[in-house]
């Protein structure tokens, strides 16, 4: 994305004028200006300079009395689903941005772009062309906390490949016909084994040695290891460390990583750099808990097997746009390389499990797009849930469009209440808007109560979003051990006459439900129904477990209601005959 479109130009504007403007702004170009009537094109050295030109010149610089418009040059065939949103308030809460974006469609990914500006920039991918167009129309020029958002298309090469022209469609071989529609759920990770890149942090002073003269060294590594390697040297100007992204097979990735380590150690000897040079791997926070393992067992085993010392940056260092943790490995080049293989093996396993889980949950909890809820890392290339014939893949659970508002009582640690509410109630208000649910925290039952009840009222999708964010907040704020999963207790009320259906004959239904969801489900015996003739069902478990259990119980209740309605209809005709 280093090609720029320069619009709103005067008819008198020429290449020399544009060269002068870019020179004054200290923005280099990689070729001549191609000037047409009223607009022009130019190439920048890289994406970073292109973005800097957009931020410095678009709407801010006049040429012959007309303000220039500068944006990425995107061919019409690639103006599909991807947008770049600039000038985002720097301290904006994720919930606010998320709730704004989802108003216009399903957001498949939202990634921050590193810039030198104070405001934030994100690249957003919507699930359809129409949704992206609507978001562009509505958000470009939108005022958000006294900042004016600027939105433009960026190239969507993936969509262009997935939607070939009619001429190309007819040339596919017989084996390719319909392959994208007929892919089995288990084939996703096998088709794309390289979707998860290795991300490294290296000291800035070694970047030159890694790249080599005119890029010779990095080209050589790329060729030998069959890898794609991006050194993000233009990002975070002045930072002590730069990130490197390596995309290849697991073997190619590890080989490239080892080569980079060897180059850094050799360069350190040449410049008499005395400090230890550890291997630093960036990993999305979603994977870190499973890498550590229960009581740190997985990490300890990797340390013992590879003779290295491994530490992981604390949760407190995570920010809105940086969900990555830094895994620091200390040892020799050989031992660090072995540790990288083991660490990435574990992370890839977690990634593949998340894909499988996402496909499973998408069918267990129909109507939800899990990509849109920010549950998986946007940089991981997470594919959408596989589709197929409803009769073979989708269980006959009630669709959300037909569901009524539900009330769930979620019990959270009393100490976490302040974090859930936020300063002056800001967090809980934003969460309520984002989820589309009513969220209230009930008074403590006693002064020394260890848990507090959160009352969440809304349709199933709102419940999913609200409960998911509450689970996440409790984890982020360290109200449970970093090595543990968050497990909360949720209460839902069911009509007393339906409690037996939830339990099943001899407890069969509730046992199957616990096996399916991995949640603990209890219908306390000898309950006295409340004034609405309802009793409580208690569900305890991690987030997904609780969600699956809640949905299954709601399905049972729907079946009970439908059965009652059918009985009422069947009893109607005899009554009319007696009249």
From Swiss-Prot:
Top-rank lineage group of the source organism: Eukaryota
Record bears the keyword Cell inner membrane: no
Molecular function terms, GO-annotated: mRNA 3'-UTR binding; mRNA 5'-UTR binding; N6-methyladenosine-containing RNA reader activity
Domain RRM: 2-75, 81-156
Gene3D superfamilies: 3.30.310.210, 3.30.70.330, K Homology domain, type 1 (3.30.1370.10)
GO biological process: CRD-mediated mRNA stabilization; mRNA transport; regulation of translation
Region spans: Disordered: 158-192
KH domain mapped to chain residues: 195-260, 276-343, 405-470, 487-553
UniProt crosslink position (Glycyl lysine isopeptide (Lys-Gly) (interchain with G-Cter in SUMO2)): 450, 475
SUPFAM superfamilies: Eukaryotic type KH-domain (KH-domain type I) (SSF54791), RNA-binding domain, RBD (SSF54928)
Chief localisation class: nucleus
Residues where Phosphoserine is found: 165, 184
GO cellular component: cytoplasmic stress granule; cytosol; nucleus; P-body
Positions of post-translational Phosphothreonine modification: 528
Resulting phenotype, residue 184 to A: Abolished phosphorylation by MTOR
Record text on subunit structure and interactions: Can form homooligomers and heterooligomers with IGF2BP1 and IGF2BP3 in an RNA-dependent manner. Interacts with IGF2BP1. Interacts with ELAVL1, DHX9, HNRNPU, MATR3 and PABPC1.
Family, as annotated: Belongs to the RRM IMP/VICKZ family.
The name this protein goes by in its record: Insulin-like growth factor 2 mRNA-binding protein 3
Source species of the chain: Mus musculus
Gene: Igf2bp3
